[in-house]
């Protein structure tokens, strides 16, 4: 599951504002080719959906929420990114922040989970297709958690407990 840090302000408050923008997150969701991730990173196993409790769980929110924003639709992603004002691009086609700097998102992964790096790389490629520059940062687990606790992660890939466990390791 990609987890966007909606309280991020560490290096660039403008990036933090985007991470808190619902339409920005939805646009990036539409840009992701989950079928490709399933085939290449998970050997064709699994089902692309949101990180919600499993269908047999009493807190399953229903199929509408489980599959919301999961279709791969780069055109819709581009339209949404344009609609929130990310229309300016650099010479390589990457979108620019309002200050003219290139938007560059960091996805943090822990190497203990080998396929997470692969997932991150596919997401980076998908986002590049809609003009969003991103990169995967592979970190040792202790550093990853330290950065999570100090609010220094932009985006992370972490597992989702689909049993509906009521507590989370995410800072609130």
Regions found by a protein language model. Give the residues of each.
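Extracytoplasmic/periplasmic ligand-capture domains
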Residues: 1-43, 47, 52, 57-172
